[in-house]
């Protein structure tokens, strides 16, 4: 077998190569001389160059979809999701700079781990082969173990890293076993080439078990119930910027890969698997919202909230129309922006190397409005968006998901979205009420007086502005989401039904 790879063959993966090259440059700079500001700036420049390349490709009028070595499919869907991953990663970089500025140990390796994980995440959304599926997933996950436990002097951070390592390794084993069962019956590792063989053997128990194991492994990565137990503990223990990365970039990559896999392999057409996804969606909505009601830790609230939000997202995927696939992308955009803003506010409030700990407890936010009114307004916007209140981006995402469920007559699922949103409104309002209460005489933890003049603060303010703008004028976002098409026969068939 003659297997050669030229530079031109890999050019469609140029954004990934830019990020990988940035990681190499960062490694060299660390070996020459440690300089936190230089390393952080280099990382941000590299991520910006990759994002700029994607924008030029998409809007330059010359973009041509490509199949790279039969392992990766670079289409509008890939580029759109890679851009979202880069935006989320840039937010994490800027938040990390201020967060670990006073960290007494080595700080520079954090950016190296982050860049490696970003490269894996970007490859994930392009994967069209079981081998690239697994390798890119592990390339994203393994650096995350280090990121979560990076501030190991805090016992919570070390615990979060070890807990995620053990449970994630278990999920990876499930994933490999599922792939092995499917390969045994289809004889192909390509999503696209195995469609006919997959449906020919779909009644085989081992094939169904293989598909189920893959879904369970992905459900773990997305922290969907009943595979959610790690989420609140890891979010609460991890450094705030790293929790932001896990909640945004890592999940964007996973949902992007999952959507491509379901459409390219045709697995979404298997009724028994749709039933499993429906059960997972309903459980996630109920478990995430009901457990969040009891929490007094803001990061744990956001952790349980994310479980419910990806339950809503599954409903759009289950609905299986051309418009509903666009609504998945819209919901991901609104969720990422809102989560960046919410976790960003927590990161700005936290300086665990000058103070006692991170600002996690709701008591730390009591009366915040009277000390930091702009930061309070920003966090309020994020809570309203997560709750799905009109004039915020979160409302648009949730409205489109409800429309997708109603259009396909999934009345029960539409009702579950409404019930879940009603429960969620309670704990989001509780966070807002606490911030406007009478402040304590001496707050335990507070944000820097000039937080808005820092890069991280400007990023959080920009996220809040986008949440409001997209809530008032969502048309550009919706149009872009519909154009982010996956190159698959099933997606083409759905587009022709419009």
Swiss-Prot record:
Protein's membrane topology: Multi-pass membrane protein
Transmembrane segments: 10-30, 44-64, 68-88, 109-129, 130-150, 164-184, 207-227, 239-259, 273-293, 301-321, 328-348, 377-397, 412-434, 458-478
Compartments it resides in: Cell inner membrane
GO molecular function: NADH dehydrogenase (ubiquinone) activity; NADH:ubiquinone reductase (non-electrogenic) activity; quinone binding
EC number: 7.1.1.-
A single cellular component GO annotation: plasma membrane
Keyword annotations from UniProtKB, A to Z: Cell inner membrane, Cell membrane, Membrane, NAD, Quinone, Translocase, Transmembrane, Transmembrane helix, Transport, Ubiquinone
InterPro entries membership: NADH-Q_OxRdtase_suN/2 (IPR010096), ND/Mrp_TM (IPR001750)
Function: NDH-1 shuttles electrons from NADH, via FMN and iron-sulfur (Fe-S) centers, to quinones in the respiratory chain. The immediate electron acceptor for the enzyme in this species is believed to be ubiquinone. Couples the redox reaction to proton translocation (for every two electrons transferred, four hydrogen ions are translocated across the cytoplasmic membrane), and thus conserves the redox energy in a proton gradient.
PANTHER family, per the entry: NADH DEHYDROGENASE (PTHR22773)
Family per similarity comment: Belongs to the complex I subunit 2 family.
Quaternary state and interactors: NDH-1 is composed of 14 different subunits. Subunits NuoA, H, J, K, L, M, N constitute the membrane sector of the complex.
UniProt-recorded name of the protein: NADH-quinone oxidoreductase subunit N
Lineage of the species this protein comes from: Bacteria, Pseudomonadati, Pseudomonadota, Gammaproteobacteria, Moraxellales
Gene designation per UniProt: nuoN
